[in-house]
């Protein structure tokens, strides 16, 4: 009974150890777009009958559209279609060369002139010299380039109207194909004057744009590194 308890305890300790190293090896993904990905317009305000043509007591005009009002979105819950046109390329290169040379010469007197023939050796030159020379060369070269392109359409909703009239928008699109799901999330700040008559706006005209593309499915699992490989990669000295 005692042996069985010790064996079970070893199994528990092993399981705890494996879970610990797995959590250390995993990399937490932080999404760019956080919070709710849609916005719902508030309830329609009750109509105020005050005997005038213009209902000035209604602070916002949900539920009706004045004849001469700009039809572009400007209220919470309004929808806008964003044309994704992201094409970013960057490259850099660096070359460095360093060289250093040094030399030294030292002259030493072997013996005084009176002791020149004591050992039966005649030193024609009663001095010797020590020469030292060193050289250090370094050459390095590196280059890096990246090219990213993202095109498509996504319809977003107005989440908040800023004090200056700009619109904070957010949206998400999900597409499921063959047991795999793809997500496109978007958020940013739009100037309503940049929205065209067809209710479209280019992503290049949106400030603080955050575009996120994710996929969940078999292909996504294949692209992930196993926890043991991550752990070995972290502790590997090379």
UniProtKB/Swiss-Prot annotation:
Q: Where is the lipid attached (N-palmitoyl cysteine)?
A: 24
Q: Which PROSITE patterns match?
A: PROKAR_LIPOPROTEIN (PS51257)
Mode of membrane association: Lipid-anchor
Sorted alphabetically, the keyword list is:
Bacterial flagellum, Cell outer membrane, Lipoprotein, Membrane, Palmitate, Signal
Q: InterPro entries, alphabetically?
A: Flag_Lring
Signal peptide per UniProt: 1-23
Task: Give the principal location in a single coarse category.
Answer: membrane
Q: List the disulfide bonds.
A: none
Could you tell me where this protein is found in the cell? Cell outer membrane; Bacterial flagellum basal body
Query: What GO terms are given for molecular function?
Result: cytoskeletal motor activity
Does the record bear Lipoprotein in its keywords? Answer: yes
Query: A GO biological process this protein is involved in?
Result: bacterial-type flagellum-dependent cell motility
Q: GO cellular component annotations, sorted alphabetically?
A: bacterial-type flagellum basal body, distal rod, L ring; cell outer membrane
A Pfam family this protein belongs to?
Answer: FlgH
Q: Which PANTHER family match?
A: FLAGELLAR L-RING PROTEIN (PTHR34933:SF3)
Family listed: Belongs to the FlgH family.
Q: How does it assemble?
A: The basal body constitutes a major portion of the flagellar organelle and consists of four rings (L,P,S, and M) mounted on a central rod.
Protein role = Assembles around the rod to form the L-ring and probably protects the motor/basal body from shearing forces during rotation.
Q: What is this protein called?
A: Flagellar L-ring protein
Source organism per entry reads Buchnera aphidicola subsp. Acyrthosiphon pisum (strain APS)
Gene, per the UniProt record: flgH
């Amino acid at each position: 009974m005692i042996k069985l308890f010790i064996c079970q305890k070893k199994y528990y300790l092993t399981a705890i150890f494996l879970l610990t190293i797995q959590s250390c090896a995993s990399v937490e993904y932080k999404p760019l777009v956080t919070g709710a990905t849609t916005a719902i317009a508030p309830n329609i305000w009750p109509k105020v009958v005050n005997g005038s043509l213009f209902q000035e007591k209604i602070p916002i005009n949900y539920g009706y559209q004045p004849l001469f009002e700009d039809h572009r979105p400007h209220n919470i819950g309004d929808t806008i279609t964003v044309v994704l046109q992201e094409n970013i390329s960057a490259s850099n290169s660096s070359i460095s060369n360093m060289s250093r040379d040094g030399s030294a010469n030292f002259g030493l007197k072997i013996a005084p002139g009176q002791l020149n023939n004591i050992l039966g050796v005649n030193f024609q030159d009663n001095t010797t010299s020590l020469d030292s020379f060193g050289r250090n060369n370094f050459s390095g070269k590196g280059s890096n380039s990246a090219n990213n392109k993202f095109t498509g359409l996504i319809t977003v909703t107005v989440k908040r109207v800023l004090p200056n009239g700009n619109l904070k928008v957010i949206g998400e699109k999900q597409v499921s194909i063959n047991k795999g799901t793809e997500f496109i999330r978007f958020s940013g700040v739009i100037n309503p004057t940049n929205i065209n008559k067809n209710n479209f706006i280019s992503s290049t005209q949106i400030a603080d744009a955050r575009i996120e593309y994710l996929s969940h499915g078999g292909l996504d699992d294949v692209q992930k590194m196993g926890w043991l490989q991550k752990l070995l990669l972290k502790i590997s000295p090379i």
